[in-house]
From Swiss-Prot:
CDD domains: LbH_MAT_GAT
GO MF term set: acetyltransferase activity; O-acyltransferase activity
Superkingdom per UniProt: Eukaryota
Pfam families given in the database record: Hexapep (PF00132), Mac (PF12464)
Keywords: Acyltransferase, Transferase
Protein name: Putative acetyltransferase DDB_G0280825
Similarity remark: Belongs to the transferase hexapeptide repeat family.
SMART domains the record matches: Mac (SM01266)
SUPFAM superfamilies in alphabetical order: Trimeric LpxA-like enzymes
Enzyme Commission no: 2.3.1.-
Stored InterPro entries: Hexapep, Hexapeptide_acetyltransf, Mac_dom, Trimer_LpxA-like_sf
TM segment ranges: none
Length: 191
């Protein structure tokens, strides 16, 4: 499909330049904020789980997220079975953010699929863009980690606390630092 014939929402989720002040996108963000407000103010974990299932694009059955949670839209977030996120998780989900099964997120983990043009003229036009983030299975992400647009992490990755992940990494590694780099390989035990 030609981008001229796409809605701003379609452009956004495909990582193309889009107008974030589009009426449909503004409405979507408002609806997400209303659900997030209910989620963050609920003491009932079953109610929070139900809200998450309404908000996210897809989830496994076994998920647990501690308040507070922040999202842009919610519908571009996809998490697998056995997902745990501690408090302070942020998803800037202009593009899809996909996380596999058996993921553990420590406090204050941030996923930024949103970005802005580097060229100042384009940036000042108000148009934005994004790049998807994809995280594999069996991943543990430490406290305060920031994952930037376009990053892909393989299976069995451990991300050290405070890391800023600016590029993609394969499976079975421990990464840490700013910018994140491989600290060591993880030997995989056969089952």
């Amino acid at each position: 499909m030609d981008s001229i014939n796409m809605t701003e929402k379609e452009k956004m989720t495909k990582g193309l330049m889009y107008d974030s002040f589009d009426e449909e996108l503004c409405k979507d963000r408002t609806e997400a904020r209303e659900l997030i407000h209910r989620f963050n103010n609920s003491m009932d974990k079953l109610e929070r789980k139900d809200i998450t299932k309404q908000l996210f694009g897809s989830t496994g059955e076994k998920i647990y997220i501690e308040p507070t949670l922040r999202v842009d839209y919610g519908y571009n977030i996809h998490v697998g079975e056995n997902f745990f996120a501690n408090f302070g998780t942020i998803f800037l989900d202009t593009c899809p953010i996909t996380i596999g099964k058996n993921a553990m997120l420590a406090p204050n983990v941030q996923f930024y699929s949103a970005t802005h043009p580097i060229d100042p003229t384009e940036r000042n036009s108000g148009l934005e863009l994004g790049r998807p983030i994809t995280i594999g299975d069996n991943v543990w992400i430490g406290g305060g980690v920031i994952i930037l647009p376009g990053v892909e992490l393989g299976d069995n990755v451990v991300v050290g606390a405070g890391a800023v992940v600016t590029k993609s990494f394969g499976s079975n590694v421990v990464i840490a630092g700013n910018p994140a780099k491989i600290i060591k390989q993880i030997p995989v035990k056969s089952e």
